[in-house]
Amino acid sequence: MACLGFLLPVGFLLLISTVAGGKYGVAHVVSENWSKDYCILFSSDYITLPRDLHHAPLLPLYDGTKAPWCPGEDSPHQAQLRSPSQRPLRQTTAMVMRGNCSFHTKGWLAQGQGAHGLLIVSRVSDQQCSDTTLAPQDPRQPLADLTIPVAMLHYADMLDILSHTRGEAVVRVAMYAPPEPIIDYNMLVIFILAVGTVAAGGYWAGLTEANRLQRRRARRGGGSGGHHQLQEAAAAEGAQKEDNEDIPVDFTPAMTGVVVTLSCSLMLLLYFFYDHFVYVTIGIFGLGAGIGLYSCLSPLVCRLSLRQYQRPPHSLWASLPLPLLLLASLCATVIIFWVAYRNEDRWAWLLQDTLGISYCLFVLHRVRLPTLKNCSSFLLALLAFDVFFVFVTPFFTKTGESIMAQVALGPAESSSHERLPMVLKVPRLRVSALTLCSQPFSILGFGDIVVPGFLVAYCCRFDVQVCSRQIYFVACTVAYAVGLLVTFMAMVLMQMGQPALLYLVSSTLLTSLAVAACRQELSLFWTGQGRAKMCGLGCAPSAGSRQKQEGAADAHTASTLERGTSRGAGDLDSNPGEDTTEIVTISENEATNPEDRSDSSEGWSDAHLDPNELPFIPPGASEELMPLMPMAMLIPLMPLMPPPSELGHVHAQAQAHETGLPWAGLHKRKGLKVRKSMSTQAPL
């Protein structure tokens, strides 16, 4: 908590702080009835642009894109250099095409013609232009003689500008570099969405585990009443059906290897064949998001008291209610709508984030890692995958950029102009050059949510099994939030994309292990054998009340049995001079272990009872929920004792019957007092 209290103020300071622009700027183009802003790229080491539009000069735009602008080439502007009295570029901003000479050479030619600014149009991407500087071809040539701003403009933006310059309209342009924030407010939105998704998915997984254990306990505890058997059978069948529908998929170590292999393969295929395989990811996202949206909304729809539509009994959809059919149709319509308008930057990101969150919740709910060993191996394998594709791959790419960043943002030379949908994306909320340039959105991959979310879900399931009041779940969720804050800080300090799993997996895994070690449950937490301490359903809100009712019923039954036993024992103990008795208290271990034959049953070994006179108890019935017969009712069934010559035969026969009687373990109750005979009974 102390670390969290330190990181939150620091993160807030980073939110409100700004830094001077680096290489991105804005070209504000204005005509008589039209204006628009365009992204420009410049070198902040050699050029200083005004910080706001009010201080930027608004100059006429000169179109020089049809003539070469390099020394030695046949250019009419070079001839004009010989006549200083004629300067057609005087007090204008020239726009020329990128040639074979350096930016400095072009800027020097434009400055010689009287231009006050130069826009160089280029077809290459930002990554390829990042190596282009204003350094002259001759290193010994100084840059002091270049005083005008020189910036690069995209070719598509040049075409858009020229489309508005038809006729005699005068077009003016102003270049400036607004301050860029270190971190935008949209990162706070992404933080809330990510932490909320992880917490909701983990809690949903724990709630499902609690309901599953509750149904299992209900199926194991059955009564002997004949009129309840049909109802119990129907309830067991319905619970079994719900259990089969809600049962999660256990993740094995073999699946970990398959997932890592497929992830590496898909990453490389997207890097080399992005325009083809991006549609594969769009299809996978559409299918998974549709199923996830249906899975999240179906519990709410099922709670509505809507009448089922009467369909033919032999129909394929006869068992599916009408509300669920309508919900499935709605989910399919939403997916089709998103596919059609997925590239609308103004509002489509809201729909994509909604579908993405439902997809993540569905995965966290349906996929279960049964042990911490499997969970740790899965998280560490994907951690190595993330670190490799972010920190190692830049040494092998031509542009020096990581494969992960190029695939996540999409190659600039992509002809499809598609973006991967497997991310949470929020547009920048502060106006800056980055809003117009290649980074209008801040993104967070689904892997940075789902992979640590598996551990959060495991912690909540473990809380259910050991009744720890969600200690593991809360600690792991807070650790995820702290790890995400550290990820944002590392991204700001290093000015590059970060392998978020490096911080998220470390924080969540170490925190969970520390909590288990402090509670001395490390072995149980590692193996996932929390059911050994199951005493209730900690994550299910409705389970506590049901547990209290069951405990009250057991206490009432035990007290009734104890009173009946006391009365029966009093009848047997009519002659205190001949018999010496002692009170035996059955321990909890003896009561719950059917194989441990307690010595307290010796007092009942002389009873010769007919098994046909006892109620029939099903073999599968739970001993805890078995209807108990007071011991006072058993006393009249005992026959008179035979002469001493027949006592041995009767005693042996009673012991033979004792092993097969279903009531042999009825007295083995926690805290149940039974009288133990210390002498043989005298003959009558």
UniProtKB/Swiss-Prot annotation:
Residues 216-242, 548-614 are annotated as: Disordered. It is found in: Endoplasmic reticulum membrane. It holds the Pfam family PA. Keywords: Endoplasmic reticulum, Glycoprotein, Hydrolase, Membrane, Protease, Signal, Transmembrane, Transmembrane helix. The active site is at residues 386, 448. Glycosylated. Residues 594-611 have a biased composition (Basic and acidic residues). Residues 1-21 form the signal peptide. Glycans are attached at residue 100. Interacts (via active sites) with FREY; the interaction stabilizes FREY1 protein and inhibits SPPL2C proteolytic activity. Belongs to the peptidase A22B family. This is Signal peptide peptidase-like 2C.
